[in-house]
Structures are given as C-alpha cells and as structure tokens.
C-alpha cells in the first residue's frame, strides 16, 4: 500500500489536500516523539540522508539534520564552501557523484529556482527541496500550517495575512499554495514594488495598507525584507518601510484579539517586526521552529518508507 504517492517533495504545488493532511497528521505524531526524553527512533536505521546546502542556513539545515538523526538515519552535511562546486563542478556533476554513493534522500537548498526539480531528474533517490531561489520552500509552509492547525484547530476558513517582501519570498509562494488548498482565506499586504506580477491570480486578496490587510485576521505572517535578493531600490528606506509595513503592538490591534503572529526567520527586528510583538504573547515563532523538526521528520519517514520497504512498526502513526 502506498501511503504517499510522491517520491520527492519539490513543492506544495502538486500536493492534494489529502497529501497535506497526511503529512500534518504524521508530523503531529513526530511532535510527541520530540517531546519525549528519549527522542531517537530506529525508523530509518541504515538509511542515508545528505544535506546539500548551496545557500547559508542555520534553522533549516539544523532542523533537517535533527529530523534525520531522530529517525535513526545516517546524516551527512555537505559543506559547499569546501566542495568541488567551488572548483567549477556543475550541480549535475555533483548530483551524479553523490548519487553514486547511494544515499536514500538528498536535501537541497539552492539559489536557483528549479534546482531541486533538476536534481530529482538526475538521481535515483528521493529529493527534498529545502528552498530553491524565489520558487518554493515546501517544508516551511508545512510547518507553518502545522503551527496554525495546532493553535486554531483548523486551516479552513481562517484569514491569514502574509505581510512584507512577497516578491522575493519562496515562503510566501508555498504558503499561498498550501493555505488555498486547505480552504483558508489568504491576504497579502505589501507595497506594490514588493508584489510579484499576477499575484491576484494566485487566489489572494491584495492590500497595500497594514491596517486594512490585518482587519479581522486570524494569523499575521511577517516576511523578512530580503535585501540580498534586491538589485534596485524596492523601498525608499528601511525606516520608512518599518513605518508603513512593520508590525508593532498598535498595528497588530487591527487583527483579531487572539491572532497568531508568525515569522519564518531570520527576523530583522525593527525592520519588519517590533521586539514587543516578536516576543509577545501572540507570537508562535518559537513554536514554528519546534514544528519544523516534526514536519521534516514526517517528510523523511513518509518518502523513505514509501520508497523502500513499507512502514515499520516503530514509525510515526498517521
């Protein structure tokens, strides 16, 4: 019996509501394991996970590493800075070299959109996209959804306002796809210069005012101003951006009283979010980090168990 009909996790696009629910239910079980004193299982014993990060990462790489190790996999982190890539080797050559080592899953983060999909075409193991350019970041969307569902009890019919640098955000794209698939009502709030062309065609409501966009929102998801991906002047100044699009306690009052405050990290305090909000009672930013490990455990077991020998008795229950 195939529990999950996909060999890879390249993006949220292509996943059904049932696929997403399956992964979230599986992740709920992983949360229980992560909160035990004895956190390690033997579910993926004897299997190998290679983390291939071409972009700097702290949270995501550590989260994937911890997820694999808690499931008993052998985990290798490849340092791109010291690799053959720096000597001119192409992504395909690197992929073929690693594939010859017979890993069971490759986790890749790359600055180019489509890198994970390309890798999946060239290797015989499963591939998980840990972020590819401005395209997608599927496990971030899944962990955000898990955080919301555990706090609100559902994803359907809730209002989620995604605010900030939507243009450069793969997190925004994956969240929009997932939340729409699960029946949520999605808003984006940003200056016109930080919205991609055709954003309204993705099934979202577009706002240019924080007060209007946050009105009656159940969830406020702030995005980092990604200045490293900007080649021009997208905002007049950081100070002006914060004045109009930063989230402080006063601005948050426009949302529902019990609205969740989220941020995928890393945060720029005083740029898109005030410390009083990031550290406040409505913030679930720390919970997002915890849910990240659980979601990645669920993804790893789902892909590797489906691909290999079927469910083991000590695995996660969905």
UniProtKB/Swiss-Prot annotation:
InterPro entries (alphabetical): Asp/Orn_carbamoyltranf_P-bd, Asp/Orn_carbamoylTrfase, Asp/Orn_carbamoylTrfase_sf, Asp_carbamoyltransf, Asp_carbamoyltransf_Asp/Orn-bd
Residues binding carbamoyl phosphate: 59-60, 109, 137, 140, 265-266
EC number: 2.1.3.2
Pathway it works in: Pyrimidine metabolism; UMP biosynthesis via de novo pathway; (S)-dihydroorotate from bicarbonate: step 2/3
Reaction catalyzed: carbamoyl phosphate + L-aspartate = N-carbamoyl-L-aspartate + phosphate + H(+)
One GO term (biological process): 'de novo' pyrimidine nucleobase biosynthetic process
Gene Ontology molecular function: amino acid binding; aspartate carbamoyltransferase activity
A GO term from the CC aspect: cytosol
Annotated binding of L-aspartate, by residue: 87, 170, 224
Reported function: Catalyzes the condensation of carbamoyl phosphate and aspartate to form carbamoyl aspartate and inorganic phosphate, the committed step in the de novo pyrimidine nucleotide biosynthesis pathway.
Family: Belongs to the aspartate/ornithine carbamoyltransferase superfamily. ATCase family.
Protein name: Aspartate carbamoyltransferase catalytic subunit
Gene behind the chain: pyrB
């Amino acid at each position: 019996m195939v529990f999950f009909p996909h060999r890879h996790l390249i993006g949220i696009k292509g996943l059904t509501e049932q696929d997403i629910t399956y992964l979230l239910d599986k992740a709920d079980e992983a949360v229980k394991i992560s909160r035990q004193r004895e956190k390690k299982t033997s579910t993926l014993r004897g299997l190998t996970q290679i983390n291939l990060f071409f972009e700097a990462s702290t949270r995501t790489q550590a989260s994937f590493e911890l997820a694999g190790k808690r499931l008993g996999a052998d985990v290798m982190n490849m340092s791109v800075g010291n690799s053959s890539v720096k000597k001119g080797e192409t992504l395909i050559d690197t992929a073929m070299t690693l594939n010859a080592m017979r890993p069971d899953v490759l986790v890749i983060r790359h600055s180019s959109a489509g890198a994970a999909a390309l890798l999946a075409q060239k290797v015989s193991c499963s591939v998980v996209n840990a972020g590819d350019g401005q395209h997608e970041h599927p496990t971030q969307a899944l962990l955000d959804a898990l955080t919301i569902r555990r706090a609100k009890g559902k994803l359907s019919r809730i209002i989620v306002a995604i605010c900030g640098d939507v243009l450069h955000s793969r997190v925004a794209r994956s969240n929009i796809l997932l939340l729409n698939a699960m029946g949520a009502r999605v808003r984006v709030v940003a200056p016109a210069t930080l919205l991609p062309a055709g954003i309204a065609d993705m099934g979202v409501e577009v706002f240019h005012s924080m007060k209007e966009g946050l009105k009656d929102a159940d969830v406020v998801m702030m995005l980092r101003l990604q200045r490293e991906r900007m080649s021009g002047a997208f905002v007049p100044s950081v100070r002006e951006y914060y004045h109009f699009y930063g989230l402080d306690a006063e601005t948050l009052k426009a949302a529902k009283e019990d609205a969740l405050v989220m941020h995928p990290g890393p945060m720029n305090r005083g740029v898109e979010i005030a410390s009083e909000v990031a550290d406040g009672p409505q913030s679930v930013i720390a919970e997002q980090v915890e849910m990240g490990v659980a979601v990645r455990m669920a993804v790893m077991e789902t892909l590797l168990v489906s691909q290999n020998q079927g469910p083991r008795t000590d695995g996660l229950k969905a």
